Amino acid sequence: MATPQFSCLLPAFFLLVVFLFLLIKELRRYKSPKTTQKLPPGPPMLPIIGNLHQMASSLPHQNLKKLADKYGPLMHLKLGEISAVAVSSPRLAKEVLQTRGLAFADRPQSVVAKLMLHNCLGVTFSRYGDYWRQLRQIFAMELLSSKSVQSFSTIMEDELFAMVKSIESEAGRPIILADKLISYLYATLSRATLGRVCKGKETLIEVTGETLALSGAQSLEDIFPSVKIFAYLNPLRPKVRKLFNRIDGVLEDIINQQEKKLLSARVDNDQLQPEENDMLSVLLKLRNGKDSKVQVTNNDIKAIIFELFLAGTVGSSTTVEWAMSEMMKNPKVMEKAQHEVREVLKGKKRICQSDIQKLSYLKLVVKETLRLHPPAPLLFPRECRGQCEVDGYTIPAKAMVMVNCWALGRDPEHWIEADKFEPERFKNSSIDFIGNHFEYIPFGAGRRICPGISFGATNVELLLAALLYHFDWELAGGMHPKDLDMLELFGPGCTRKNPLSVIPSICIPSHDDN
C-alpha cells in the first residue's frame, strides 16, 4: 500500500490557522470599546476582508465612482487590515494633494516595489524626506527638465522616423497600433537613458514588461501586514526575486560599461560628447562628483533607471492609443486634426520637435484625451503620515489615499457633457495638466506630481503628429467608427481592453532628408 501523502494538506492547514487568527482579531476589534474617531462614510464591510470585494472589480476607478455617488466624495474603505480613503471631488483633491500635501506626501510601499527597487529607492515609492527631496531635485534639474527633454530631440526624431518607416512597410494591412508605439518609446527611452550602444538593453526591456505585468498585483502580505506567515506563502516573492536578480545584474553591467566608455571617451575637461550625454552619464557624474550637493549610489542609479523604464512607456503609449481611438470614433475631430498637421507641416518629410508648438488643435486633442483617459485613473496612492482631519473627518495614520482623477475629469459639476469627446472645450481655456486645476489632474498634483510630464507630453504630441501627417487610417475588418468599443482594461495603466487594430495608408511618404 502506498504511503499516505499528507503534504497536500499543509496549505489548507496554514490557511485554516490564518483564518482563525484573523477571525479572532476581528472579534476582538468588534468587542473592543468604540473609538471616538469620525471616519468618512463608506459602504458596509465584510468580516476580515472589509471592502476588498468592492475593489476586486476589473475597473476599480469606475466602481469607486459609483460608490462615491452613494456615500460621498470622501469615502472610507477597509482593504483587509489597511484603512483606505477614496477622494472623488476637486475640492477634496486639492485639500489632500495641496493644502495638506505634507500630511499625505508618503507612498504605500508594496512587496513588489520593495523587492524590485532596492527597498523602495528612487523617486516614485521612497518616503518623503531629505532623500526624496534630493532625488526630486535630480529629476527636476538634471534628468527631465525642459532643457534636458529638448536635448533629446534628435533621438526622438530619429526613432519617430524609424517608426514611420516601419508602419509604411505594412501599409494596407491591419496593425496593432500599440505595438508600434511601445517599440518607439522603448527605443527612445533606451537611447535617452543609456546611450546609443549598450549591451543588456533587450533584457532590461523584457524584464520591464514582466515587472509591469506584476506591478498591479496585491498580495495577502500587502493587505494583511500583521500576518507574517503570508511573507513565506506569498507566490509573488519568488517570481519577483527572480526578476530582481536578472535586472540587478543587467543594470550593474550597464553601469560598468558606461563607466568604461566615459573613461575612454572623456575629452575637453571632462565635457561629454553629445551622444554620451544620456541620463545614466548624468547620474554617474553626480555619483562621482566630490562637490555635488546630491550624492547617489549605484543602487540609487539602478532604481532610478528601472523606474524610468517602468513609467516611461505605458502612460505615453496608452494616451496615444486612446487619442487615436477617440478620433477614429469621431471622424470630424480626426479630419480637423489631420488638416492642421498637414497645413502646418506642408512639404516636410520628417517631423521635428520644434514643429509641435505650432499644432494648437492637436494639443487640445491631447488635453481632452487625458481628461477622459488619464494614464493612472487612481493616480499613485498616497499614504497619510500621521492621523489628521479632512473635511471634518478623521483620516487614520498610514491610511492609503486614492485620488480618483478619472472621476474628477468626468464630474458633471465641472464639465459640460462630461462623457463626450470634445477637444474644443479647452479652446481659450487656462486649464492645464500640470496640477493647477484640480478638476483636471491626469499627472497628479502637489509635491509628488509626476516628474516626467514634459518628456511624456512631448512624446505623445510627436507620435500623434507623425501618425496624422504621414497616414490615413481606417478600422480593421471594415468596422464602422460608431461600432468601435471604448472598453477599458485596468492595470499598470488604463489601456484599451481590445487593442486598436487599424489599417494605415500612406498619404505623405517619409524621406531621409528633412
UniProtKB/Swiss-Prot annotation:
Recorded GO MF terms: heme binding; iron ion binding; monooxygenase activity; oxidoreductase activity, acting on paired donors, with incorporation or reduction of molecular oxygen
Role summary: A cytochrome P450 monooxygenase involved in the biosynthesis of pentacyclic alkaloids natural products such as alstonine, putative antipsychotic compounds. Catalyzes the conversion of tetrahydroalstonine to alstonine. No oxidative activity towards ajmalicine.
Protein's membrane topology: Single-pass membrane protein
Family recorded in the similarity comment: Belongs to the cytochrome P450 family.
Protein name: Alstonine synthase
Gene3D superfamilies: Cytochrome P450 (1.10.630.10)
Annotated catalysed reactions: tetrahydroalstonine + A + reduced [NADPH--hemoprotein reductase] + O2 = alstonine + AH2 + oxidized [NADPH--hemoprotein reductase] + 2 H2O + H(+)
GO biological process: indole alkaloid biosynthetic process
One cellular-component annotation, GO: membrane
Species this chain originates from: Alstonia scholaris (Dogbane)
Residues bearing glycans: N428
Entry's localization field: Membrane
Binding site for heme: C450
Membrane-spanning parts: 4-24
Keywords attached to this entry: Alkaloid metabolism, Glycoprotein, Heme, Iron, Membrane, Metal-binding, Monooxygenase, Oxidoreductase, Transmembrane, Transmembrane helix
This enzyme's EC code(s): 1.14.19.-
Pathway annotation from the record: Alkaloid biosynthesis
Cofactor requirements of the protein: heme
